[in-house]
C-alpha cells in the first residue's frame, strides 16, 4: 500500500508541475508580448497556442498570414476576438517568433529555429501571395544558402525536425538536409583521399599509406550523426551508401551510434538493434567482430526478429576465425534448467562458417591434400577448430548440457579441420568428468570423435591411463602408441635388423579394438583386458629398446669421430711421405699401416654394431 500511495503522490506532483509550466508559459507569453506590441493601441484579437495566450492586433497578422486572414474573414459578422491555433508546429515559442515577424520586429534565424519557422510559415500561410519577403521565402533562403552548405547545421536542423514530423518531411526539409549531409561527407572523403596522394621516387602518383588519426580521413562527422533519432539516422546512412561513402566510415558511424544509444535504457532498443543490423555494410571486417557479437547478445535479449539474428549469425560465420572464446560465450536467456550458454546460436554460426564458399569445397579439399598450410581457408579452419575445442572445454562442465548438444558443436566442423586432437580430447574428458552417469554407449559416441592418431605424446600418455574412457578406446590409444614407438625406432636407427617373425605377428594381431560380433560381452571384455596388458608390456619393451638404442647411438658417434681423426692422421703422414726431401717415394710402406688401422677400426665398429643389434 505504501508503494502505491507513493506512486500516486508522484503522479500528482508531475501533473501539478505540468499545469504550473503551462501557466508559466502563458504568463511569460503575455509579459513578452507587452514588450514589443503596440502599447498605445488596444488589442483586438487573442491567439491561443498550446495554452499560451497572445494579445495581439488583427492588422499585422492578416497582412502576413493567409490562415489568420481567412479565419478573421469567416467571422467578420461576429467580430471574432479569440482564435485558437491547434497543432501549431513549434508551439508557443515558435508562434511568438512568427508574430514578431508580422510586427516587423527583427530576430535572428538560426539552425536551431529555421525548421520550426519553416513549418509555421507553411501552417500560417505566410507566403509571397500575401506579402513580399514573407517568412516562408526568408526561411527557404536561409535553409538553402546557409544550412545546406554546412554539415553540422544540417544535423542540427534534422535534430530539431524530429518533433515536426511528418510536416517537416512533407516540406522536404528532411530530404534536403539528408542529401546535403551525404554530399558533404562524400566530398570530405574525396578531398581527404586527394590530400593523401603523393609522388613516389619513380615519379608515379600513389596513395600514401600513412595511418592518420581519427578525423583526418574525412570522418569527423561520425560523432555528429550520433545525436539523431534512429529513423532519421537510417535515412542518412542509406543516402551515404548511395553517394559512395566508404564502408569503413559507415561501419565506424554505426559503432559510434550503437555505443551511444544502446548504453542507455530505451523503449526503442529493439528497433535500434534491428535497424543497425540492416545498415551494416556487406563487406567483412568493416566493424570489429566483438561489436557484431555484442549486437547478437542484444538481439537475443531483446528478442528481435528472426531475420535480424540470422543476418548477424551469417556475418559472424563469415569471419569466425577472428573471434575469441569470450565472443562465443553468449548467455542463455530462455528459461530455468537450460544451459548456461546459448549452444544453438553458436551451432548456427559454425554451420554458416562451414558452408561459406561451398562452391569452393572441392578446391579446398585438393589444397588440403596437397598439404599447403599457407592457404587462407585452411588457416581460418585451423583457427576455428582451436576456438571450438576451447568452447567445448568451457561448456563441458555444465550439468544441463545434453550429450546431443555437445556432439552438435563437436561435429560442426569437417574432419580435416583438426590437425591435432588434444583440445577435443581435453573437452571430452571434462565432459566425462562432469557427467559421470553416462552410459557405455554414450561414452563410445564421445570417444569416436577423437582420432587417437592425432594425439600428442603427452595427451596419448594421459589417455592411455584415463579410466573415464571406454576400455576399447584405451586399447586404441595403446595400439597407436606402439606404432609411434616402432616408427621412432626405425627413424632413429635405420640399420636395425628385421623384426622377429613372432614380434611382427604379435604387433599385427593387436587390432584397433574391433571386436567379433559372435563373442559374448564377457568374452569381449576379457579379450580387451588381455590385449590391454599385452600392449602395455610391448610398449614397455619398446621403450627400453629405444633407450638402449639411443645410448648405443651416442657411443657409435664417438667411435666414428675417433676413427675419422685416425684416418686423417694417416692421410697426412702419407702426403708428407710423398713430399720427402730425399726424393724417394715409400708410399706402399707408409700406406699399409694406415689401411691396417682403418680395417681394425672398422672391424671394431662392426662388432659393436652387431652386439648392439643383438
From Swiss-Prot:
Pathway terms, separated by semicolons: Protein modification; protein ubiquitination
NPH3 domain residues: 219-484
InterPro entries (UniProt xref): BTB/POZ_dom (IPR000210), NPH3/RPT2-like (IPR043454), NPH3_dom (IPR027356), SKP1/BTB/POZ_sf (IPR011333)
Keywords: Coiled coil, Phosphoprotein, Ubl conjugation pathway
Residue ranges of the TM segments: none
Composition bias, Polar residues: 507-521
Start and end residues of each BTB domain: 43-111
Region spans: Disordered: 492-525, 583-614
Compositionally biased spans, kind Low complexity: 583-597
Coiled coil: 522-562
Entry's Gene Ontology BP terms: protein ubiquitination
Job description of the protein: May act as a substrate-specific adapter of an E3 ubiquitin-protein ligase complex (CUL3-RBX1-BTB) which mediates the ubiquitination and subsequent proteasomal degradation of target proteins.
Family: Belongs to the NPH3 family.
PANTHER family: OS12G0117600 PROTEIN (PTHR32370)
Comment block on domains: The BTB/POZ domain mediates the interaction with some component of ubiquitin ligase complexes.
Full protein name: BTB/POZ domain-containing protein At5g48800
Native source organism of the sequence: Arabidopsis thaliana (Mouse-ear cress)
Amino acid at each position: 500500500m505504501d508503494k502505491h500511495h507513493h506512486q500516486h503522490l508522484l503522479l500528482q506532483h508531475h501533473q501539478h508541475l505540468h499545469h504550473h509550466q503551462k501557466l508559466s508559459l502563458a504568463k511569460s507569453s503575455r509579459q513578452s508580448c507587452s514588450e514589443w506590441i503596440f502599447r498605445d493601441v488596444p488589442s483586438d484579437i487573442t491567439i491561443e497556442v498550446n495554452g499560451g495566450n497572445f494579445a495581439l492586433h488583427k492588422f499585422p497578422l492578416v497582412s502576413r498570414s493567409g490562415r489568420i486572414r481567412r479565419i478573421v474573414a469567416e467571422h467578420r459578422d461576429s467580430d471574432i476576438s479569440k482564435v485558437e491555433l491547434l497543432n501549431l508546429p513549434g508551439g508557443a515559442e515558435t508562434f511568438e517568433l512568427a508574430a514578431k515577424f508580422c510586427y516587423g520586429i527583427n530576430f535572428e534565424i538560426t539552425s536551431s529555429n529555421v525548421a520550426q519557422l519553416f513549418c509555421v510559415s507553411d501552417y500560417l500561410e505566410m507566403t509571397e501571395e500575401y506579402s513580399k519577403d514573407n517568412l516562408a521565402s526568408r526561411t527557404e533562403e536561409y535553409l538553402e544558402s546557409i544550412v545546406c552548405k554546412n554539415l553540422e547545421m544540417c544535423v542540427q536542423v534534422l535534430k530539431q525536425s524530429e518533433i515536426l514530423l511528418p510536416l517537416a518531411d512533407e516540406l522536404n526539409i528532411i530530404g534536403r538536409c539528408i542529401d546535403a549531409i551525404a554530399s558533404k561527407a562524400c566530398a570530405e572523403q574525396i578531398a581527404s583521399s586527394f590530400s593523401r596522394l603523393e609522388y613516389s621516387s619513380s615519379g608515379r602518383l600513389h596513395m600514401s599509406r600513412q595511418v592518420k588519426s581519427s578525423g583526418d580521413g574525412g570522418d569527423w562527422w561520425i560523432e555528429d550523426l550520433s545525436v539523431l533519432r534512429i529513423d532519421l539516422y537510417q535515412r542518412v546512412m542509406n543516402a551515404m551508401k548511395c553517394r559512395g561513402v566508404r564502408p569503413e566510415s559507415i561501419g565506424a558511424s554505426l559503432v559510434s551510434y550503437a555505443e551511444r544509444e544502446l548504453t542507455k535504457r530505451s523503449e526503442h532498443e529493439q528497433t535500434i538493434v534491428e535497424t543497425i543490423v540492416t545498415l551494416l555494410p556487406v563487406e567483412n571486417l568493416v566493424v570489429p567482430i566483438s561489436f557484431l557479437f555484442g549486437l547478437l547478445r542484444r538481439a537475443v535479449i531483446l528478442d528481435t526478429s528472426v531475420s535480424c539474428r540470422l543476418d548477424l549469425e551469417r556475418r559472424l560465420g563469415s569471419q569466425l576465425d577472428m573471434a575469441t572464446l569470450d565472443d562465443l560465450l553468449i548467455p542463455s536467456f530462455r528459461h530455468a534448467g537450460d544451459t548456461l550458454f546459448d549452444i544453438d546460436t553458436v551451432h548456427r554460426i559454425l554451420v554458416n562458417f562451414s558452408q561459406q564458399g561451398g562452391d569452393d569445397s572441392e578446391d579446398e579439399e585438393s589444397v588440403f591434400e596437397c598439404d599447403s598450410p599457407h592457404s587462407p581457408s585452411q588457416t581460418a579452419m585451423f583457427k576455428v577448430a582451436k576456438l571450438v575445442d576451447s568452447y567445448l572445454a568451457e561448456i563441458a562442465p555444465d550439468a544441463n548440457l545434453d550429450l546431443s548438444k555437445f556432439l552438435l558443436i563437436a561435429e560442426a566442423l569437417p574432419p580435416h579441420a583438426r590437425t591435432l586432437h588434444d583440445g577435443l580430447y581435453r573437452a571430452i574428458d571434462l565432459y566425462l568428468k562432469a557427467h559421470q552417469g553416462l552410459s557405455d554407449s554414450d561414452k563410445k559416441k564421445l570417444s569416436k570423435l577423437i582420432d587417437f592418431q592425432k594425439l600428442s605424446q603427452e595427451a596419448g600418455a594421459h589417455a592411455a591411463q584415463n579410466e573415464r574412457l571406454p576400455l576399447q578406446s584405451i586399447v586404441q590409444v595403446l595400439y597407436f602408441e606402439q606404432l609411434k614407438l616402432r616408427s621412432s625406432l626405425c627413424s632413429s636407427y635405420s640399420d636395425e635388423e628385421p623384426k622377429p617373425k613372432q614380434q611382427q605377428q604379435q604387433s599385427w594381431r593387436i587390432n584397433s579394438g574391433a571386436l567379433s560380433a559372435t563373442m559374448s560381452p564377457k568374452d569381449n571384455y576379457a579379450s580387451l583386458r588381455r590385449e590391454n596388458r599385452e600392449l602395455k608390456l610391448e610398449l614397455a619393451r619398446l621403450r627400453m629398446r629405444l633407450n638402449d638404442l639411443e645410448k648405443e647411438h651416442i657411443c657409435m658417434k664417438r667411435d666414428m669421430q675417433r676413427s675419422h681423426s685416425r684416418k686423417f692422421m694417416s692421410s697426412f703422414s702419407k702426403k708428407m711421405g710423398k713430399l720427402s726431401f730425399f726424393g724417394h717415394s715409400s708410399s706402399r710402406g707408409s700406406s699399409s699401416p694406415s689401411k691396417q688401422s682403418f680395417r681394425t677400426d672398422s672391424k671394431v665398429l662392426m662388432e659393436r654394431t652387431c652386439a648392439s643389434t643383438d
